[in-house]
Structures are given as structure tokens and as C-alpha cells.
Amino acid sequence: MGICLMKRCCSWFLLISFLSALTNENEAISPDGEALLSFRNGVLASDGVIGLWRPEDPDPCNWKGVTCDAKTKRVIALSLTYHKLRGPLPPELGKLDQLRLLMLHNNALYQSIPASLGNCTALEGIYLQNNYITGTIPSEIGNLSGLKNLDLSNNNLNGAIPASLGQLKRLTKFNVSNNFLVGKIPSDGLLARLSRDSFNGNRNLCGKQIDIVCNDSGNSTASGSPTGQGGNNPKRLLISASATVGGLLLVALMCFWGCFLYKKLGRVESKSLVIDVGGGASIVMFHGDLPYASKDIIKKLESLNEEHIIGCGGFGTVYKLSMDDGNVFALKRIVKLNEGFDRFFERELEILGSIKHRYLVNLRGYCNSPTSKLLLYDYLPGGSLDEALHKRGEQLDWDSRVNIIIGAAKGLAYLHHDCSPRIIHRDIKSSNILLDGNLEARVSDFGLAKLLEDEESHITTIVAGTFGYLAPEYMQSGRATEKTDVYSFGVLVLEVLSGKLPTDASFIEKGFNIVGWLNFLISENRAKEIVDLSCEGVERESLDALLSIATKCVSSSPDERPTMHRVVQLLESEVMTPCPSDFYDSSSD
């Protein structure tokens, strides 16, 4: 009897174990689990976090980065920010129909946003910024009636902004800045109330939100349906051809009339395009070696127009200001900040104006007007390093590149170690390294990030403006240190050596940025391939030293990065003939 009872117990135990295993297997392959595994299988690389997702696990709710509803056990949040994810977004994500929060920003995801994401009707927040996502914004996102936050900034999106997004009545935050979007910004619903900050960095957008008028041909056409229904319709082509004939006659008449008006009124139209400095404007000069009266400077300011623009950036428009005695200055216009901020702004400018160093662009003074601040800097005829590397026809030889790197390092090191108070730049990039007539580098725009950090618009611009140069921890926390500058400097060195932008298209195709590309080449023992093929006179020993320094600077761990003082020491001892006294040269050329 005991033996029979034991056999029955064993049979029941085996049956219960089998049913339990079957239940666990069914849980592991739930629709939500399958969707997440499809995402995992499509990712080509990561820091290992999603490698812990196992199909045999009984519950995907225990997976890293996954949050489930306590009662329904459905996935409600997927948060995998800054985990070095490289790969496409699979359409299976659309099966997570209870998903409320999708946070995949600060990775290396690419290809397009799946239209199936529009099936996740419970979504309240989509954060895909700082990736390499291409294609158009799916119009299906307009179906997400509960969506509150949508951030697609710092990607490679193209096409028009779908008008369907204007239907999102609960949307409070929207950011598509720094992409390649084109056409007219829809003026439906919330989209009509958004400011310029949501769209910065898309050169071919137009609309009242960014104060750019759309023309009838081109931009407004690009803002049509993103589904591409325009096509080469024969009737449209016929109408277009007929309209062109009449249009040419109209253009000829307009040109004739325009020339007549220009002779009469043209010069009046270009006056005071920069700013009306009358009525309470004052000039503050920091260095006593400028022999100009305030009225002379103000007179020159009033004559500036769009023909004098030499650059535009996240901090403002830059104009070329020529004085009667032949001296030339660069004038940076910063729009008036919030009321009550003037005193702090002026105090900080006094600090910046006291800094003089061979490898920094001198701030000579500023004009305080009722509507804006106009900062007066030394003008450097060599333009920016960005222009020299990527936009001009001439090629920088090896010696010029090395000297530029060393000069930029010395300027940044001076800000970190010899200024009181110390200055963290936060926006080191090639367009902020200016060159004089001898191609000697000077760091510009230092201190401006701190001046404007309390402005919401600036925070958006600074992060967007330096995308590709930003240290990982800065993108994650928003907290800048000297080591975030060191990382950006390391990226700058790689840019100078390679002649490629940090987010060059050749990297994006492989899911890299310039740092990822370097790491890949190092793993393949091909680091030398990073050098620009057009660069002449490359010295192998100097190249090895520069690659070693750059690799240290772009370490993912801030603690492993050298200080800029140490970087200068390495450059002087391993790349050039040591001349340490030059580092502390605070004289201005």
C-alpha cells in the first residue's frame, strides 16, 4: 500500500512539474516577450544588458529595462538609455499595445521608426533622441491620442513633419531639432503654438513657428503628405509646364520693377537689420587699447545688415564689423534674456573680458541695448576649423593639423587650470576653434554656456549643437565637468586626424559615431586608417602619439580621461619639441 501511494505521489509530482514547466514556457513566449526578443535579436551590439534577456525566462517583466503592470503583467515601459544599442527598431515593437513609455535615447539605433508604433495607443512618452534614425516621421504617431512627450531630436530624419501630429491634444513637449526635415511646419493644433526651439537645426524647414516664410515652390510642396502621393502625375506636369511660361513673364516684370525699386529704396531696406541700438544703448570696453568712442561704435552697429553676417550658431548670429581705421572685429548678437538676468550676465562678461591668452579669442567689450547683447570679439581671418576641414577647397597638411590640435589644447587647459574661477567650455567643437592668418588655433565661445544655461532654449541648443562631441555622462545627466570638455577635445582630435565630421554618413551607415569607428578600427588593428588620405606629410610617431592621446580622452569613464593640463604635457613631450613655458603664455597677439 505504501509503495502504491508513493508511486501515485511521484506521478502527481511529475504531472504538476510538467504543467508548471509548460506554464512557464507559455509565459516566456507571451506576445510582449516575443516583441522584446525580436528587438533583442535585431540589435547588432550593446553593452550586454539585453543579452540577459532569455527566451526561457518565465517572465519578461524581470528583464533589465522592462517594467510591467503589477496586475496585468503587461509591458508598460521600456527604458534602455545609453546602453550602446546598435541596430534597427523592429516593427514588432508595435505589438506592445500597453506600452506607456519608450526610452531608447542616447544609443546608436538606426534605420526608420516603424509605423507600427502607432498601434501602441497607450504611449505617453517616446524618447528616441541622440541616435542615428533615418527615414520619415510616421504619420501613424498621430494616432497616439495620449502622447505627452515626443523627442526625436539629434537624428537623421528627413521628409516633412506629418500634419497628423497636430491632432495630439495632450502633447506638451515636442522636439525634432537637428535632423534633415524639410517643408512647411504644419500649423494644426499644438504644432501652431510651438517655438523655434522644437525645430532648430533643420535648415529646410519653414513656417511661422521659426519666423521663416515658405515660398510657393519647394518648401510648401515639401510640407505635403509624407506618404509621397505627389509623384509625377502627368496632369500636374502639364499644369506645371503651362504655369512656367506665364511665370517667366511675371518674373521678368518683377526683376525690372525690383531693379528700379532697388535703385530708389534698396539701401534703406538694409539699414538697421541687426538691431536698433538707439535709446539707452551703452558700450562697455574691457581693454583700454581700443581708441574708439562709444558713438563711433554705435554708428557702425547701425550700418550692419545681412551682408555682414559671417556665421550663425547656437548662441547667436555673428557679424563682421569694420572700423574706419581698418581694424576688424567679430560681433556676436545674443537676444535679450529674461528680465532681471542683466546683472548676472554683465558680471560674468566682466570675468570673461578679463581673460587674455594667446590661444583664446579675446572678448573686447559689449553693447548693452534694449533688445539684445552685442559681444565684440577679435576677428580672425582664417575662419573656423570646421570650415578649413569640411567646407573649403584647400587641404590642411600634417604640421598645420598638429599645431591646431596643440593650440586648442593649450587654450582649453588655460580655461580649466589657470582661470579664476575655472571655466568649463561645454561646447568644444571644430566650429568653435577659430584660426588666424597663420592657421594658429584659438578657442572661442568659452563661458557662454554658463551665461545662458538658465534659458530653456539654450539648453536645447547646446546639447543639440554639440551632438557627436558630447561625453556619454553629459548626455545622460546634463552635468558638465572638465572631463566632459576633455571628451569633446578627444573627438575634435579624431575629427582633425580623419577630416570627417563626428557624425559622418559613413559612420551612421554602420551604426557608429567617430568614437565608435575608432574603437572598431583599434579592435581590427587598423587604427592608422583613421588618417585623412588627403593629408600630406604624416609622421608615424606623431600619429601614434595623437591616437593614444585621443583614445584616452574619449574613454567612456570620466575618471580614466586625463586632465587638459596632462594632455598638453603629452602633446609637448610626445608630439612636438617640448616648450612648456608656452602653455602659461597669457599674452595676446
UniProtKB/Swiss-Prot annotation:
Residues that bear Phosphothreonine: T460, T461, T466
Substrates-to-products reaction catalysed: L-seryl-[protein] + ATP = O-phospho-L-seryl-[protein] + ADP + H(+); L-threonyl-[protein] + ATP = O-phospho-L-threonyl-[protein] + ADP + H(+)
One Gene Ontology cellular component: plasma membrane
EC number in record: 2.7.11.1
InterPro entries found in the cross-reference section: Kinase-like_dom_sf (IPR011009), Leu-rich_rpt (IPR001611), Leu-rich_rpt_typical-subtyp (IPR003591), LRR_dom_sf (IPR032675), LRR_N_plant-typ (IPR013210), Prot_kinase_dom (IPR000719), Protein_kinase_ATP_BS (IPR017441), Ser/Thr_kinase_AS (IPR008271)
Processing after translation: Autophosphorylated.
Residue ranges occupied by any Protein kinase domain in the UniProt entry: 304-576
SUPFAM superfamilies xrefs: L domain-like, Protein kinase-like (PK-like)
Membrane topology according to the record: Single-pass type I membrane protein
GO molecular function: ATP binding; kinase activity; protein serine kinase activity; protein serine/threonine kinase activity
Gene3D superfamilies reported for this sequence: Phosphorylase Kinase, domain 1, Ribonuclease Inhibitor, Transferase(Phosphotransferase) domain 1
Tissue: Expressed in the root meristem and elongation zone, and in hypocotyls of etiolated seedlings.
Topological domains annotated Cytoplasmic: 258-589
Function as written in the Swiss-Prot or TrEMBL entry: Involved in the signaling pathway that regulates cell wall function, including cellulose biosynthesis, likely via an 1-aminocyclopropane-1-carboxylic acid (ACC)-mediated signal (a precursor of ethylene).
Summary of subunit composition and partner proteins: Interacts with the ACC synthases ACS5 and ACS9 but not ACS2, via the kinase domain.
Protein name: LRR receptor-like serine/threonine-protein kinase FEI 2
Biological source species: Arabidopsis thaliana
Gene name for this UniProt entry: FEI2
